[in-house]
Amino acid sequence: QAAGRSINLAMSSRGINALKYAGIFDQVKPLLIPMTGRMLHLKNGAKELQPYGQKKDEVIYSVSRFNLNQILIQTAEQEYNVDIKFEHSVLSYDTESAKLQMRSPIKDFFLDAQGILVADGAGSIIRKAFANKEPIMPTEEILPHSYKELTIPANNDGSFQLEKNALHVWPRGQFMLIALPNPTGDFTLTLF
């Protein structure tokens, strides 16, 4: 697990339904922590729980992005024969021929793509290739914000230092700190 790459997800019932549809909910379920609401930590030290719903089952779930990704990748590779490549980058993409020029840690090579699912992030070569192509015409706006991942460890006895079943938020003007619980008693925090 790379530092700064494990920001937790807050998963709604739609995400749960997608996991059930994919047949992997039972693998993910032990990783989920229900959060009944948003716990605001105000400047004066007061705390205010804002429930997500009126019923007990109206919750969202905290789940480790890293652990969820491991399950999704393993399922895609083993169950659906998907070939996932890490540490590869796209050098160019020809929209007419659907040909990708790729770079791996070992060599540069070309791929003919019948279909392509891209997750190459900010500065995407694929997005740029479609920049003036109808009907897609994507746009890109790099935000001036950044983030830092932090951790609140579990107590010595393994218990949570904060309320377990809440998404904790410290709103501070242009900055915000959020904390989501993990099954191990710690919290993953993100400072935006």
What are the roles of these predicted feature ranges?
Residues Q1:
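N-terminal Rossmann-like FAD-binding beta1-loop-alpha1 element of flavoenzymes
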Residues G4-T75:
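Active-site-adjacent segment of FAD-dependent monooxygenases/related oxidoreductases
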Residues Q74, H88-S92, S97-F192:
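Conserved FAD-binding catalytic core of PHBH/FMO-like flavoproteins
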Residues D83-K85:
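General small-molecule cofactor/ligand-binding pocket signal
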